[in-house]
A protein has these predicted regions:
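Conserved beta-loop-alpha segment that forms the PLP phosphate-binding cup at the N-terminus of a helix
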Residues: 82-107, 120-121
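PLP-dependent aminotransferase-like
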Residues: 106-166
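N-terminal "arm"/small-domain region of PLP-dependent enzymes with the aminotransferase-like
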Residues: 1-65
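Conserved N-terminal alpha-helix of the aminotransferase class I/II PLP-enzyme fold
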Residues: 46-92
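Active-site phosphate-binding strand-loop segment of PLP-dependent enzymes
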Residues: 140-200
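Residue-level detector of conserved catalytic or cofactor/ligand-binding positions
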Residues: 245-256
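Short beta-strand-to-turn element immediately C-terminal to the catalytic PLP-Schiff-base lysine
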Residues: 214, 236-241
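Conserved active-site segment immediately N-terminal to the catalytic lysine
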Residues: 206-225
């Protein structure tokens, strides 16, 4: 088991900065030297660690050292088999898991109030949505989560579906019974995908709703920046040991 006290990327960046390396590559601000206005705004400490992928800092496209170790630490913290760092928001994590499980013409069962990133994934990959109406709380005027009965009905009517997609929670904080839905999906040979853009804290608090990985989800897209305290756009794609990693390829480098 890896130490949860470690921060491999942070440690590597501090060491890199201490070496006072003169960069001859991107980014163009050259650790702040080339853009004094931005350096004044963000601070020199920030600018000197905004650097490109290099051997000491690893590469997100094919991590072999500090990024790989950091992802392993994250996976253990979230109770997942694997964790992949995402640098362009949970939108990319949602799209990655949807594209991984369903090819063109194949079905994914999902609530009608999914995030538009899930809809865009269907458009990109050509998968077919089977919508489940989540219902509406008339007093509050907000959409709810999917009921187990409605999901079961959708599964029985679409036994060829490849996955069930669950918001855990919805934008308004409503949770479906993700454990029962995961069990239903698996009983019919389907993956369970959890959009946990607003559920990062479920993994680290007492008396919280059940987190996706603990409920048996095969994939979970987790927004670290929304309730995890990290910078905007940072996210994780978590996978369980039920997932063949050849289904997934995250190709977002730290710097284009």
């Amino acid at each position: 088991m890896l130490s949860q006290e470690r921060a491999p990327i942070y440690e590597a960046l501090k060491e890199y900065r201490a070496k006072r390396i003169v960069p001859f590559d991107v980014p163009g601000h050259k650790m702040g030297r080339g853009n004094p206005e931005l350096t004044e705004f963000l601070g020199r400490e920030c600018m000197t660690v905004d650097v490109n992928s290099s051997k000491p800092l690893d590469n997100l496209c094919h991590p072999v050292s500090v990024i790989k170790e950091a992802e392993q630490i994250a996976a253990e913290a979230f109770g997942a088999k694997n964790a992949f760092f995402i640098v362009n928001g949970t939108t990319a994590a949602v799209q990655a898991m949807a594209l991984a499980v369903a090819k063109r013409g194949e079905k994914i069962i999902m609530p009608r109030n999914v995030h538009r990133s899930a809809i865009n994934a269907l458009i990109l990959g050509g998968a077919v949505p089977v919508y489940v109406n989540p219902g509406v709380n008339k007093e509050l005027g907000i959409p709810l989560g999917m009921t187990v009965e409605d999901v079961e009905k959708a599964i029985l009517e679409n036994p060829d579906a490849k996955a069930v997609f669950v918001n855990n929670p919805t934008y308004y904080g409503v949770c479906s019974d993700i454990k029962k839905i995961a069990d239903l999906a698996h009983a019919h040979g389907m993956y369970l995908l959890a959009d946990e853009a607003h559920g990062t804290h479920f993994y680290f608090g007492d008396n919280m709703p059940l987190a996706g990985m603990k409920a048996g989800a095969d994939f979970a897209a987790v927004s670290m920046h929304k309730s995890g305290g990290s910078l905007t756009q940072s996210s994780f794609l978590l996978t369980a040991d039920t997932v063949n990693l050849s289904l997934i390829h995250i190709s977002e480098p730290t710097r284009h």
